[in-house]
């Protein structure tokens, strides 16, 4: 009697489990479900055998869309934040994230850029407006000349209504340049305060572009110019490289008071870990010689001269 009761209980348990399995959707692959005769489920309940994955090419296409613009425009361009991630989606910089929405304004760092229809000769432009730029520490200025407008880095005392000169001429005598004018280094007198300096002629400004910074034209030697950077390091470039006269705008940028941690989050800066680190030999000031002069002049080697 006990054996018959146990057999009937097991038979009822197996039938109940089969009924429950038929009612509940399964997560088995589609090929295995179709081969099983006992489970006849509708196609809508059959789960696919893979999960769609976003490829890195799709991410990179969306990530650099606002950077890959080839046509210049003075209109603000919508900017996509990276969050410290590269094109694969992995975090590369942990201190970047969040922040207020920003629009990118294309800055023309090549000051001497004559229009296509005109000959390459000095030309003047008028400052339309000087405004704040969320993507950099310095202020920017909208200048107009001829049939075009463009954004440039504003100097310290630049204001709307000013007229600036852009030249590529190097004369026998040094010019009496005004603040905001752009001239080759060979045309400026020694001791001039400069900013937005080119490393190679026609490449565009690459040095001294931060707010409140300026360099000094120390001397001119054999067709080259020696410049002192804000870090006190000296740099040698060709005298045909263009520079802007004066000091970069927003001089009090380094004296601003953040006031609270939330303002850094507005700027897109994430908090640090807060881990205490013992101050070792890397901390504090040290007496060390200045680094050697950086040269962008490709002089012929001694072997080539011999």
Curated annotation (Swiss-Prot):
<keyword id="KW-0809">Transit peptide</keyword>
<dbReference type="Pfam" id="PF00181">
    <property type="entry name" value="Ribosomal_L2"/>
</dbReference>
<protein>
    <recommendedName>
        <fullName>Large ribosomal subunit protein uL2m</fullName>
    </recommendedName>
</protein>
<comment type="subunit">
    <text>Component of the mitochondrial ribosome large subunit (39S) which comprises a 16S rRNA and about 50 distinct proteins.</text>
</comment>
<dbReference type="InterPro" id="IPR002171">
    <property type="entry name" value="Ribosomal_uL2"/>
</dbReference>
<keyword id="KW-0496">Mitochondrion</keyword>
<dbReference type="GO" id="GO:0005739">
    <property type="term" value="C:mitochondrion"/>
</dbReference>
<dbReference type="GO" id="GO:0005762">
    <property type="term" value="C:mitochondrial large ribosomal subunit"/>
</dbReference>
<keyword id="KW-0689">Ribosomal protein</keyword>
<dbReference type="GO" id="GO:0005654">
    <property type="term" value="C:nucleoplasm"/>
</dbReference>
<dbReference type="GO" id="GO:0032543">
    <property type="term" value="P:mitochondrial translation"/>
</dbReference>
<comment type="similarity">
    <text>Belongs to the universal ribosomal protein uL2 family.</text>
</comment>
<dbReference type="InterPro" id="IPR008991">
    <property type="entry name" value="Translation_prot_SH3-like_sf"/>
</dbReference>
<dbReference type="InterPro" id="IPR022666">
    <property type="entry name" value="Ribosomal_uL2_RNA-bd_dom"/>
</dbReference>
<dbReference type="GO" id="GO:0003735">
    <property type="term" value="F:structural constituent of ribosome"/>
</dbReference>
<dbReference type="Pfam" id="PF03947">
    <property type="entry name" value="Ribosomal_L2_C"/>
</dbReference>
<dbReference type="InterPro" id="IPR022669">
    <property type="entry name" value="Ribosomal_uL2_C"/>
</dbReference>
<dbReference type="GO" id="GO:0005743">
    <property type="term" value="C:mitochondrial inner membrane"/>
</dbReference>
<dbReference type="InterPro" id="IPR014722">
    <property type="entry name" value="Rib_uL2_dom2"/>
</dbReference>
<dbReference type="InterPro" id="IPR012340">
    <property type="entry name" value="NA-bd_OB-fold"/>
</dbReference>
<keyword id="KW-0687">Ribonucleoprotein</keyword>
<dbReference type="GO" id="GO:0006412">
    <property type="term" value="P:translation"/>
</dbReference>
<feature type="transit peptide" description="Mitochondrion">
    <location>
        <begin position="1"/>
        <end position="60"/>
    </location>
</feature>
